[in-house]
A protein has these predicted regions:
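Transmembrane helix-loop-helix hairpins at membrane boundaries of multipass inner-membrane proteins
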Residues: 2-102, 469, 473-474
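Membrane-interfacial loop-to-helix junctions in multi-pass inner-membrane proteins
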Residues: 16-30, 91-106, 121, 142-163, ...
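Juxtamembrane/interfacial segments at transmembrane-helix boundaries in multi-pass membrane proteins
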Residues: 42-57, 163-222, 249-256, 260-270, ...
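Helix-loop-helix module between adjacent transmembrane segments
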Residues: 65-122, 144, 210-214, 241, ...
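Alpha-helical multi-pass transmembrane bundles of energy-transducing inner-membrane proteins
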Residues: 99-106, 112-200, 285-350
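Interfacial segments of multi-pass membrane proteins
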Residues: 137, 229, 256, 307-316, ...
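Predominantly late transmembrane helices and immediately cytosolic-facing juxtamembrane segments
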Residues: 219, 332-338, 401-436
Length: 478
């Protein structure tokens, strides 16, 4: 078998043995243990027993943390299987498997602890720690200047977290002026913060959401996201888009839970503006890009916009937003891992040199097509149902301007994505290329993601649906 490959994405014979080959299976074992542990915990624990507190109440397991612990560890299992299967075919991954695995495990440790944080400052610190773990991984990418991109990622992340920290300090000032002893424990904040907020409280909320919005890739501070997702190694792109993204979502949900029932109309307006702006920016950029990995990145900006608009609506769209977040994690994992396979064979992220992908890579091409359909919100995938619920919530809220803009921008993204990706998949190649052999082990996690997406669209298992409902209710949903 002969395939085109870059030095960073070598053929199986070029990779050779590595002293640390055991790290691949070890990564999978850790991922299985994490997912199995949280699954058993959920199976043996009634939602009525939650929340449960640990470590002096600094850690908590409630519906929100449990939902995202199950989600990110399920995604991590798929990514770890992919990494393990690629050790024999990628020289760079084989040579750097030990540091990559160590950083990935440190990242997942910070993720799991951060999702359980019952303290806003502790959650903030764990988000920063995940960034510090991922930055060296981004710097190992095969783009033209991966270290520069990693520094940009660190700079934007630090700026967003600094804005969030400034927001927390504004909340502290608000509490001092009102004679309240400020505690950032989530359960204590919910009780202590007065319903009638002052200007310091509003400023703090606005800064926190703006900071977390930039971490999610919401406009206007989104510039770090496309270049980071494109430049990072495939597995790191998936960790960024499908795992770290979710701890930032949890931070936003925690803030909304604490201030539920307060005068937060301005927060809804802030989320609505950032969401609409993000959708508009994503639509324009998707029309212009001819790079399939960067296109997925701009689709992530659009996804953040949809989530922000849904959260701005509040009660009516809460369940749809959570279903969308869960579906989005599986879609981005599927697309980035499949894009990594395309990059390994063709040696480029550009769409122009690619044609007939589905003939050369029948399995990966088909999975990339399925992922594209899921990304665009086709039935029977979970994203379709989630978008319908969000749009229904927007109509119920009476915001027809947001409804019209969201429908228009999603339509533009739909057409532009199809125009860019479908010729790459189905057009006949300029020269004959024999089909490339693909292993079931590499395809297994992607098949798992597709199965999850179909289940979310056709039939969400009752335990997962109950968890989604409880989290939706915690932010004022129904």
């Amino acid at each position: 078998m002969s395939v085109t490959a870059t030095p960073d994405m070598a053929t199986p014979r070029a990779a050779g043995p590595t002293r640390h080959a055991w790290m691949g299976p070890a990564l999978v074992v850790v991922a299985v243990a994490l997912l199995a542990g949280w699954s058993v915990f959920y199976a043996r624990t009634s939602l009525a027993e939650l929340p449960l507190y640990f470590a002096g109440r600094f850690l908590v397991i409630d519906a929100t943390s449990l939902l995202f612990l199950l989600l990110v560890n399920a995604v991590f299992l798929g990514i770890s299987v992919y990494m393990s299967s690629r050790v024999s075919t990628s020289r760079v991954l084989a040579d750097k498997l030990l540091p990559r695995s160590a950083l990935t495990l440190a990242f997942m440790l910070a993720m799991n602890l951060g999702l359980m944080a019952n303290h806003l400052l502790l959650l903030w610190a764990f988000i920063e720690l995940t960034t510090l773990c991922l930055a060296p991984l981004v710097a190992q990418g095969d783009g033209p200047a991966p270290r520069r991109v990693a520094w940009h990622y660190l700079l934007y992340s630090s700026m967003s977290l600094a804005l969030t920290f400034l927001g927390l300090m504004c909340l502290t000032r608000s509490a001092q002026l009102q004679g309240i002893e400020m505690s950032f424990m989530l359960d204590e904040m919910t009780v202590a913060i007065p319903s009638a907020g002052d200007s310091w409280q509003r400023l703090g909320l606005a800064l926190m959401l703006f900071g977390m919005g930039s971490k999610l890739g919401l406009a206007p501070l989104y510039a770090w996201l496309p270049e980071t997702y494109e430049t990072a190694p495939t597995s790191t792109s998936a960790l960024l888009a499908a795992v770290q993204f979710n701890i930032s979502i949890v931070m936003v949900l925690r803030v909304l839970q604490v201030f539920r029932g307060h005068d937060t109309g301005f927060v809804a307006h802030e989320l609505l503006i950032m969401g609409c702006l993000s959708l508009t920016v994503a639509a324009v950029q998707v029309m212009a890009t001819r790079n399939y990995k960067r296109l997925i990145a701009y689709a992530s900006v659009a996804s953040s916009g949809v989530i922000a608009i849904g959260l701005s609506v509040g009660r009516a769209a809460a369940y749809g937003v959570l279903l969308y977040v869960v579906s989005n994690a599986f879609v981005k994992s599927l697309l980035f891992l499949t894009a990594g396979r395309l990059r390994a064979v063709y040696g480029t992220n550009e769409t122009a040199p690619l044609a007939g992908v589905i003939r050369v890579l029948p399995f990966s091409g088909a999975l990339f097509a399925v992922g594209t359909f899921a990304l665009l919100g086709f039935p029977p995938f979970g994203g379709f149902m989630a978008e319908m619920l969000i749009l229904s919530g927007i109509v119920q809220a009476g915001n027809l301007v947001a409804f019209t803009l969201m429908c228009t921008m999603l339509t533009i993204i739909f057409v532009a994505t199809g125009r860019t990706l479908f010729p790459m998949l189905w057009n006949p190649p300029a020269q004959h290329r024999p089909p490339v052999r693909e292993t079931w082990l590499t395809a297994l996690p992607k098949l798992g993601f597709v199965t999850a997406l179909v289940l979310l669209g056709l039939y969400t298992p009752a335990p997962i649906s109950a968890l989604l409902v409880q989290v939706a209710q915690s932010i004022g949903g129904r």
